């Protein structure tokens, strides 16, 4: 065994790789849903304006005012405690997406307000195009660079969210593996500190490396997409 075995004889390296698949796929799936919801909500608010824009932004501000960790734990605790791993996987993606779209919607709404008065958008309205078609066809190309950069920078938060839930026993459960679950198992095993402290270091190092890499990649993409950069 490359990294040894845990207290039940399972290969730590194999579980680390399997946990990467679970943790990273939750991040990618969650951020994809978040970007779609945030773009549509922000685009519609910027397009229609008025009362719809006011109501949508007050709801967004309400969500953003609540500490995300407490809201995450509250939403998870309100659900049935005995989901299997597949059901838990879906629920974590839904919960993280439901909490993450508000920030994206607020930024997209601000960008859409200026686009709504553009001549080509007014021409599309005069030709009878539907609001959704206008938002996708004319707004999306102008905000796509922000969505890509925002998604890259937000993936670490989703990985950390899954790790936090699993570490607290509210996320992925045995016999599946995730980085947060591996941290929880290492903490609860009294033999770890005496015989195999690397059981705790390996999932922690994987989370740290993933968060660092995505943050660096996001900074690079943000600099590349900055129109003010020389």
Residue map of PLM features:
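Alpha-helical transmembrane segments of integral membrane proteins
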Residues: 5-230
């Amino acid at each position: 065994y490359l990294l040894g075995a845990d207290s039940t004889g399972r290969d730590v390296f194999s579980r680390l790789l399997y946990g990467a698949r679970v943790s990273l796929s939750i991040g990618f799936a969650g951020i994809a849903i978040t970007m779609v919801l945030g773009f549509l909500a922000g685009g519609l608010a910027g397009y229609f304006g008025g009362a719809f824009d006011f109501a949508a932004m007050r709801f967004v501000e309400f969500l953003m005012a609540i500490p995300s960790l407490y809201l995450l734990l509250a939403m998870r605790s309100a659900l049935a405690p005995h989901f299997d791993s597949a059901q838990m996987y879906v629920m974590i993606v839904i919960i993280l997406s439901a909490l993450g779209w508000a920030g994206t919607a607020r930024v997209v709404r601000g960008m859409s307000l200026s686009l709504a008065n553009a001549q080509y958008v007014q021409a599309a309205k005069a030709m009878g195009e539907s609001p959704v078609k206008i938002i996708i066809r004319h707004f999306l190309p102008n905000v796509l660079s922000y969505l890509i950069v925002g998604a890259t920078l937000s993936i670490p938060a989703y990985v950390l969210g899954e790790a936090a839930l699993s570490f607290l026993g509210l996320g992925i459960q045995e016999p599946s593996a995730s980085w947060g679950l591996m941290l929880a198992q290492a903490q609860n095993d009294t033999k770890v500190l005496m015989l195999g402290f690397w059981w705790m270091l390996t999932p922690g190092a994987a989370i740290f490396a993933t968060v660092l890499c995505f943050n660096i990649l996001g900074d690079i993409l943000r600099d590349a997409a900055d129109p003010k950069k020389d």
